[in-house]
Amino acid sequence: MAHFAINCFSDILQMSVNLNVILPQRTTRHGFTGSTPDGKFPVLYLLHGMGDDQTIWQRRTAIERYVEGTPLAVVMPTTHLGFYTDMHHGLPYWSFFSQELPALCQQFFPQLTDRREYTFAAGNSMGGYGAVKLALGMPDQFGKAVSLSGALDLVGMEKHTPATPLMQNIFGSTEQLTGSDNDLLALAEKTCKTHTNLPKLRICCGTEDPLLPFSRSAKARLIQLGYDVTYQESPGVHDWAYWDAQIRQAIPWLLEGMEM
């Protein structure tokens, strides 16, 4: 695998942004094995959780080893504390992720596919929210999404525990969040009314994770709306031991049915 650390300017955010990228490389040296597809690389946008950045997946998991021997490219960007959202008070991160980031990746790495069925998103916690939001908000561009302990039912969470000032800066009040495109279950309902080719979703949560009730409520509503949901609960808390194991299991699911 080849690793790239990118720093570039975002016109939407009006600042420099960082992203790490892993690309397949044909090699058998030093214990690595690698291959490249005949066509373009399928691509996984791998999103971090709150308080982390574009480096965290390579620091806390063996993601590079998990994708070696596959044609999968991995793009790891950062949203800082922006929750992959056009913030109520702050920066327009959703516009960056949905409009500018894919175009930048195509510009820098033209070997990345732009085919929906080979474009994926995954993330942990806040990143799980972002991954599912990309799939629901851009169903013509993303074929699959993986949420690991994702904050998928924010409205339910805020009914259980009042929103912090940080969350209010991101989403506004609970009333402003409810029914908006930042409310994933409302977005899911909107998308299933306007699209027939819906993204496939994989939702995983540890049985000792405080977000488990909200993973269950999100799963139930998504299935009710007609989404293809692969759901898994297994022992684990809200930590990297759980996410490392689950992203490893998710890679074959993402590539399922793909000739390699």
Tell what function each PLM region has.
Residues 1-260:
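Non-catalytic cap/lid and distal C-terminal segments of serine-dependent acyl enzymes
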